[in-house]
Amino acid sequence: MPKVPVYNVKGEQVGEIELKDSVFGVPVNVAVMHQAVVNYLANQRQGTHSTKTRGEVRGGGRKPWRQKGTGRARQGSIRAPQWIKGGVVFGPKPRDYSYKLPKKVKRLALKSALSSKVRDNEIIVLDEFKLEQPKTKKVAELLKNFNAKSALIVVPQGEKNVELSARNMPNAKALYANLLNTYDVLKYEKFIITKDAVAIVEEVFA
């Protein structure tokens, strides 16, 4: 079982915690993590892009000039693809990019991501992190105390003020422990998690 220090919000060590091998000590599988990240990003895509074909562009019903005798190339419509303001050939149409990844693959990817954070000493366990009201300054101070350029902050469900405090920071994100995903774990430099959230992660994803 990997042992990691426990800190307070000021960055001072106040103890140690043992993390479960089944969640934080598995072999790091890069290929599976890649699959999970690609799946996550694909599922986020709106897919509302659209272009018009020659049949959908307004106008172009009349033949621009007669077929023969002008010396110019024959044309059937001013909305054909080769014309300016013509339709698009094989352009994008609205589609759903989402697809399902097996639960076991998703879970293995998340465990690999968490284990990589432990291996690279990029995990920071806090004794607690609670805010009485949303304060972005408090989250900024937390990152500064741990020299973190960016961080994912994982808290138990219900810590709404922490989530709101990190919302308008480009280099930080707060996430409930039960909503943890591979993409967010890997995206940020530091993985900051409270002791209570560790227990939830170990229970949900073990």
UniProtKB/Swiss-Prot annotation:
Residues 60-71 have a biased composition (Basic residues). One of its GO terms (biological process) is translation. SUPFAM superfamilies: Ribosomal protein L4. It holds the Pfam family Ribosomal_L4. The keyword RNA-binding applies. Keywords: Ribonucleoprotein, Ribosomal protein, RNA-binding, rRNA-binding. GO terms for molecular function: rRNA binding; structural constituent of ribosome. It comes from the Bacteria. GO terms for cellular component: ribonucleoprotein complex; ribosome. The keyword Ribosomal protein applies. Residues 45-76 are annotated as: Disordered. Part of the 50S ribosomal subunit. One of the primary rRNA binding proteins, this protein initially binds near the 5'-end of the 23S rRNA. It is important during the early stages of 50S assembly. It makes multiple contacts with different domains of the 23S rRNA in the assembled 50S subunit and ribosome. Forms part of the polypeptide exit tunnel. HAMAP family: Ribosomal_uL4_B. Belongs to the universal ribosomal protein uL4 family. This is Large ribosomal subunit protein uL4. It comes from Caldanaerobacter subterraneus subsp. tengcongensis (strain DSM 15242 / JCM 11007 / NBRC 100824 / MB4) (Thermoanaerobacter tengcongensis). The gene is rplD.
